[in-house]
Design a protein with these regions (language model features):
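Conserved motor-region signature of P-loop NTPase helicases/translocases
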Residues: 1-67, 177, 219, 226, ...
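A basic/glycine-biased coupling hinge at the interface between accessory DNA-binding modules
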Residues: 17-19, 39-208, 214, 218-221, ...
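Short, function-defining helix-loop hinge/capping sites that tune catalysis or transport
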Residues: 92-94, 210, 242-243, 282
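A short amphipathic helical element positioned immediately N-terminal to and/or at the very start
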Residues: 210-211, 415
Length: 486
């Protein structure tokens, strides 16, 4: 046992039997809790390593968890199933996919490959309105987004078709809406079958097909239910509905079939998350998963981690004052718990560490940031901060004057943006004022169009049967070829 765990962390680690909801605020050591819980389960002989399933949101988080568990255990205990949802489903489908007619040698398509695949087969689908004559590829991206959202919501092609056909019986539904929905449902069904026929899957298919496997082959499901004595899920607030369904099915509660079991099952299922950190709704994450956990498993124990080891108390108080605007749709309200974070570390900062700056435009904001960095690093004589607005503990703002008196290195400064596109004006100003920077996120080398094409070239050269890569190469404007020519 890690002696550095605080009391709440220790309770979470040592909890033995039944469902467990760990509400872990930012910087409260949730990764340490999950890894120490896995180690404790093994050391206490509650389960063997290969009888534990831990699911995370990203490959980076999975690797970190795997490394921490590996470092805490003797050699030979590295058999815990620690992976992302997609990697777990990929592993299951490679082994069991034949039960639902899936070729185990399927190809997993990236977003770009999915676009090329759908575009290639556009005239093989029953498209009318969504394949306009003047611009047949106009809705390709929209169709893929729509299909992806259906997958995120655990909607099968058969269910979508049933829903679409039922619209014709509703007087309140216009004919055009019915026809559009039926066209989309029909194409969703055809596109899904087309992917299966060509042994091509996308990331949404991994989740949906694993759910399909478990629903249609109860003997396969039972085998994995008996295998995994403990299931742990990290960043539960970031899971989409289908991922939550997958976890619940493995835990003995299928939301589509087993609602009569609500309150009767109490699996060894641990979910860790924080509704206040739910930021991925734009890509399908369903905050309802964590909000409804106690409804599905009313016997679940609830542990709240509030001791923060990462931040200044003023920052925590300001964030708390802001996030309370989401009430009453927060676990703090629905579960009647106190989620206010308490800083456990001291920092060599002034008390006035949280300031709100407003600018007239994106360019003005970018210019202010660049000049402020120059001022902070001692590369500018002008005081760029003339007035700021500061959040107090209640979340209200108060005006103050701020004159930086401390010099930093460029590497001491970080700029966080809500979306990659918001960084453009900032980067332009950093370049203009000569501020060195490194741009993170997913806009690096491998996401540049010319690099994608180059990779497709290399793939086509090494495997002439790779139709997706070949199509991407041939569809380049430089060749002047029509899509009907290949």
């Amino acid at each position: 046992m890690n002696l550095n765990l605080n009391e709440k962390q220790k309770q979470a680690v040592e909890y033995k039997k039944g469902a467990l909801l760990i509400i872990a605020g930012a910087g409260t050591g949730k990764t340490a809790v999950i890894t120490q819980r896995i180690v404790h389960i093994i050391n206490s002989k509650w389960a063997k390593p290969d009888e534990i399933l831990a699911l995370t949101f990203t490959e980076k988080a999975a690797d970190e968890m795997l490394q921490r568990v590996d470092e805490s255990m003797p050699i030979g205990y590295g058999d815990v199933w620690i992976s992302t949802f997609h990697s777990f489903c990929d592993r299951i489908l490679k082994q069991e996919g034949y039960n639902i007619g899936l070729d185990s040698d399927y190809i997993l398509m990236s977003a770009a490959q999915s676009y090329v695949f759908l575009r290639k087969h556009l005239f093989d689908l029953s498209l009318k309105k969504f394949r306009p004559y003047g611009n047949p590829t106009r809705f390709v991206s929209d169709l893929l987004d729509h299909f992806s959202r259906l997958q995120d919501e655990d909607v099968s092609p058969a269910e979508y078709l049933e829903y679409a056909r039922a619209l014709s019986k509703k007087d309140s539904v216009e004919k055009e809406e019915y026809e559009d929905t039926l066209e989309l449902a029909t194409v969703y069904d055809e596109y899904t079958k087309l992917k299966m026929k060509n042994s091509m899957l996308d990331f949404g298919d991994l989740i949906l097909l694993t759910i399909k496997l478990f629903r249609e082959k109860p003997n396969v499901l039972k085998r994995y239910q008996e295998k995994f004595k403990y299931i742990l899920v990290d960043e539960f607030q970031d899971t989409n509905y289908s991922q939550s369904v997958l976890v619940n099915i493995l835990s003995g509660l299928d939301p589509k079939k087993d609602m009569d079991k609500v309150g009767k099952v109490n699996p060894n299922l641990t979910v860790v998350g924080d509704d206040d950190q739910a930021i991925y709704k734009f890509r399908g994450a369903a905050i309802s998963n964590i909000l409804q956990f106690k409804q599905y498993y009313p016997k679940a124990k609830k542990i709240v981690l509030t001791e923060n080891y990462r931040s200044h108390q003023k920052i925590l108080d300001s964030a708390y004052g802001l996030i309370k605007n989401n009430n009453p749709y927060r676990l703090e309200v629905t579960e009647k718990v106190d989620k206010r974070l308490i800083a456990m570390e001291s920092f060599p900062f002034d008390d006035d560490v949280v300031n709100l700056i407003t600018a007239e435009s994106e360019d003005a904001e970018g210019e202010w940031i660049a000049k402020e960095i120059l001022s902070l690093t001692g590369n500018s004589d002008e005081t760029s901060v003339k007035g700021t607005q500061k959040f107090n503990e209640s979340g209200q703002s108060a005006f103050l004057e701020l004159v930086p008196d401390r010099k930093y290195k460029f590497s001491d400064v970080a700029i966080l943006v809500r979306a990659n596109a918001h960084a453009d004006s900032i980067v332009q100003n950093l370049r203009y004022f000569g501020v060195p920077y490194k741009l993170g996120g997913s806009r690096g080398l491998y996401f540049r169009d010319e690099i994608k094409v180059l990779i497709s070239f290399l793939k086509a050269l090494t495997d002439y049967t790779d139709e997706v890569s070949m199509y991407m190469v041939l569809s380049m404007q430089e060749w002047g070829l029509s899509t009907r020519e290949f």
